[in-house]
């Protein structure tokens, strides 16, 4: 199965210390037999543990941020933002909306609303089918792990769209003005790129890490921007979706 590369190795920085292999949950995607470790992308689940562990800066996530910045002023673009923005840009998530619109993004949507739709479908699936086990699937690394290494778990993956997919489909259906707009997806996850390619929705995968690095490099202060507002209805509970227990807290809305 061909998988888009989401993690790169800088050969000049890699010292072949194998820290990346030690923390990798699947091991097989790494080849440490040369002077530097290489990645077999078709076996990499894209979890990013190796990036965190590499003290030499030899591993980086691959996203579309540079391409997005090149094209944003010349294309019709909207952005959707993951609930994790409240953690990655603590206290400045609303200013991020204003910054995005200042560079040419026409509309910004909160994925928390899509997370509530996803959770609703989880609850409906459980009530209807009474499965022995349900594995939530917002994380593409988990999905890839099941597909590549534990196929016996595939039957337990929730047969529902992810919060990102729900949000994009909601925009296409209820906001016809943006039907032909490019969609920039802002999240902590490099592996999300694979999901968007599979469902053929989403054009730019932008990691919050690379976005924060850009702000630091260019001395952009988000607190100098006014608070912006999302262009979709606010979520009731799923703003905490990315925190421990966030999914269950959201599910309580649908379970009396």
Regions from the PLM with identified roles:
Residues 13, 43, 156-160:
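Alpha-helix N-cap/helix-initiation motif
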Residues 2-9, 15-40, 45, 49-65:
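Iron-sulfur cluster-binding cysteine motifs and their immediate structural context
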């Amino acid at each position: 199965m061909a998988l888009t590369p989401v993690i790169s190795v800088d050969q000049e920085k890699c010292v072949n210390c194998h820290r990346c292999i030690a923390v990798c949950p699947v091991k097989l995607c790494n080849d440490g037999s040369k002077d530097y470790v290489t990645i077999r992308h078709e076996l990499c689940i894209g979890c990013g543990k190796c990036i965190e562990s590499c003290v030499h800066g030899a591993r980086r996530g691959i996203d579309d941020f540079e391409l997005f910045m090149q094209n944003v002023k010349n294309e019709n673009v909207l952005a959707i933002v993951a609930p994790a923005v409240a953690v990655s840009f603590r206290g400045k998530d609303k200013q991020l909306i204003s910054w995005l619109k200042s560079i040419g993004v026409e509309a910004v949507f909160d994925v928390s609303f899509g997370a509530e739709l996803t959770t609703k479908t989880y609850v409906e699936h459980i009530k209807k089918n009474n499965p022995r086990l349900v594995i939530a699937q917002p994380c593409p690394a988990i999905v890839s792990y099941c597909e590549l290494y534990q196929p016996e778990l595939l039957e337990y993956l929730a047969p529902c769209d992810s919060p990102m997919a729900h949000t994009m489909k909601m925009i296409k259906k209820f906001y016809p003005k943006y039907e032909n707009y490019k969609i920039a997806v802002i999240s902590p996850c490099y592996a999300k790129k694979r999901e968007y390619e599979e469902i053929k929705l989403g054009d730019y995968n932008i990691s919050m890490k690379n976005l924060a690095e850009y702000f630091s490099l260019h001395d952009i202060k988000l607190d100098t921007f006014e608070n912006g507002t999302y262009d979709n209805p606010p979520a009731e509970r799923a703003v905490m979706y990315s925190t421990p227990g966030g999914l269950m807290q959201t599910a309580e809305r649908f379970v009396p």
